[in-house]
């Protein structure tokens, strides 16, 4: 029996965009469950009892409750951690200096991650727009000339799809198989764009907190 005109609600649980991409082949523009894990010093893990999976940056760029708590405790002198531990675990700021230190450390860590990535967010945006406009093999083969920073990635895609021997000027349309590969490539770029945006939003968030806590100097 088939029922028509009924709304169907699908629930994918608390998957991040990377997990959705791996398991279902799509991502969400605004996924409240998306998150970014940043590398942490071993002492950060050992100085608190928060599980590793709770130490991340939210989709909106804000550090998780657990990550902030762990960083505040880690930034506290070891001889004071026991007395201030209950405040850190309750989500309270321990001091202005401590909070500024935590925000500076987090922003620097995010900035380092972004700098070590092979492409910039602006380059990914341009590449994504260009891929969406591709209609034939000539346009695809010309991409490597336009996007120097993504040349290796583009060449890898061309080689993986056995297109390296296609002559320029052939005006051949993309095969169904190549288009499917391009769709997957498109999704991969979308994912890394959102990954980078979370890191950038975290830097902005940390900068705002630092500005709000820093003493204001007014002209005489």
Where do the language-model regions lie?
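Charged low-complexity "KEKE/polyampholyte" interaction tracts
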Residues: 19, 24-220
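Conserved AWS/pre-SET-to-SET junction and N-terminal core of the SET lysine methyltransferase domain
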Residues: 1-7, 208, 215
């Amino acid at each position: 029996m088939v029922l028509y005109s009924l709304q169907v609600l699908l629930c994918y649980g608390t998957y991040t965009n990377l997990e959705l991409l791996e398991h279902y082949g799509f991502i969400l523009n605004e996924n409240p469950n998306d998150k970014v894990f940043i590398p942490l010093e071993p002492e950060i893990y050992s100085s608190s009892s928060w599980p590793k999976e709770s130490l991340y940056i939210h989709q909106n760029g804000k550090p998780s409750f657990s990550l902030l708590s762990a960083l505040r405790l880690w930034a506290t002198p070891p001889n004071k951690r026991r007395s201030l531990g209950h405040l850190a675990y309750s989500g309270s700021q321990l001091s202005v200096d401590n909070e500024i230190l935590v925000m500076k450390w987090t922003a620097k860590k995010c900035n380092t991650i972004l700098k070590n990535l092979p492409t910039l967010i602006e380059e990914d945006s341009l590449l994504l727009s260009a891929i969406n406009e591709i209609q034939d093999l000539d346009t695809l083969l010309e991409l490597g000339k336009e996007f120097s920073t993504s040349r290796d990635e583009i060449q890898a895609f061309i080689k993986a799809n056995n297109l390296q021997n296609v002559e320029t000027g052939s005006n051949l349309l993309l095969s169904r198989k190549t288009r499917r590969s391009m769709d997957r490539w498109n999704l991969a770029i979308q994912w890394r764009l959102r990954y980078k945006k979370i890191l950038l939003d975290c830097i902005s968030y940390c900068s705002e907190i630092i500005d709000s806590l820093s003493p204001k100097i007014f002209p005489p």
